Regions:
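Cytosolic, membrane-interface loops and tails of multi-pass inner-membrane proteins
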Residues: 23-50
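Membrane-embedded alpha-helical bundles that constitute the cytochrome b-like, heme-associated redox core
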Residues: 20, 26-27, 72-75, 93
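Core segments of transmembrane alpha-helices
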Residues: 53-66, 114
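Juxtamembrane boundary at the C-terminal end of a transmembrane helix
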Residues: 119-129
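N-terminal signal-anchor transmembrane alpha helix
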Residues: 2-33
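Membrane-embedded alpha-helical transmembrane segments of multi-pass integral membrane proteins
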Residues: 14-17, 21, 84-91, 113-120
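Structural signature of hydrophobic alpha-helical transmembrane segments
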Residues: 75-84
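Interfacial loop-to-transmembrane junctions
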Residues: 91-116
Length: 129
């Protein structure tokens, strides 16, 4: 079995995007003087925190379904959807930090990619002999 390099790169990109959201929370803590363990503060801090939390919640679903789709269906299509998912998460984060009502397009992109990956994983699993 060959090493699935492209899915590994997608996974790394997703984890880097998550780490970026964590760093944004740290920056917002410093800028707005929100000391740990506080989880509330000015709206810009809370928006950054919500981006990080939601991204973590989405990663829990994305990573397993992405790898199942890549291994059991199509590595190429799964990787393409994975890269688009990462872009959607970045757009979600940027939009949310600009204004909470601007988070929709990024969320929609990443959500649709997750659903497509889920369908690929299910079809791939049931097509195995």
């Amino acid at each position: 079995m060959s090493v699935p390099a492209l899915p590994a790169v997608v996974s790394l990109a997703a984890l880097i995007a998550y780490q970026g959201s964590a760093m944004a929370v740290g920056q917002a803590r410093v800028k707005h003087k929100v000391l740990p363990p506080a989880m509330s503060g000015p709206e810009p801090f809370e928006c950054a925190l919500r981006v990080q939390q939601n991204t973590l919640e989405q990663l829990v679903f994305f990573l397993p379904v992405f790898w199942l789709a890549a291994l059991m269906s199509s590595e190429t299509w799964a990787s393409l959807l994975g890269f688009i998912w990462v872009g959607g998460r970045v757009a979600y984060g940027v939009g949310y930090r600009m204004a909470p009502n601007k988070r929709g397009p990024g969320f929609g992109i990443s959500f649709l990619c997750s659903i497509a990956l889920l369908v690929m994983a299910i079809l791939g699993a049931f097509s195995q002999r």
